[in-house]
Amino acid sequence: IQMLDNLAKKLGVVLYVSGEESPEQIKNRSERVGISGTNIQVLSSGNINKIFELAESLQPKFIAFDSIQTLRDSSSQGAQGSINQIRDCGYKIINYAKSKSIPVLITGHVTKDGNLAGPKLLEHMVDTVLYMEGDKYMEMRILRVAKNRFGPEQEIGLFQMSFNGLKSIDNLSLSINVNGNIGSGRTLVPIVEGSRC
């Protein structure tokens, strides 16, 4: 929601389609992180055709879908979140975005293995795939680039999760809390569950 607020300030109207949260939940979260959201239009629906009808009347400059697993196309087979539904809704979203020349953000769930849930085809249809990963011991979030058609894939973004939302970490050294036990002979090494970074 913070990203959508920043985009709305720069671009104009953005549409936030949420099948995950109700408008009341989104409003509460927005107020908690200090977002007025005057140019953010919220639609709590999973009906892909209804979403595009509203988009036609609003003419948003950006659309965020949260999440692809909650969308449903009545002309497609399968239950909401099924491979067919994810594939067909993904096609419709991408075709709509191309026809209107607007960027879209599609959030999705990951499997226990850490892969994008749904058909692998979805990853091939989009320009960029990002993973937001949590940390077990700190309130840090890492945004990793898994695919980037227009730039490098070796980039990460570091964020601190707080009551007021995500805050960018510009200097990791200053953000790591070692409980004040910095002394001679101590070494701080960045590792992820035993793997070398």
Regions found by a protein language model. Give the residues of each.
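Long C-terminal interaction/binding lobes of large macromolecular proteins
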Residues: 65-70, 79, 97, 104-106, ...
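Substrate-engagement module of ASCE P-loop NTPases
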Residues: 84-109, 125-136
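A generic structural signal for well-ordered alpha-helical segments
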Residues: 7, 55, 97, 122-123
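Short regulatory helix/loop adjacent to the ATP-binding pocket of P-loop NTPases
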Residues: 30, 115-125
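Conserved P-loop NTPase
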Residues: 36, 56-62, 69-71, 134-197
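Short loop/edge segments at beta-strand edges and connector loops
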Residues: 44-46, 108, 170
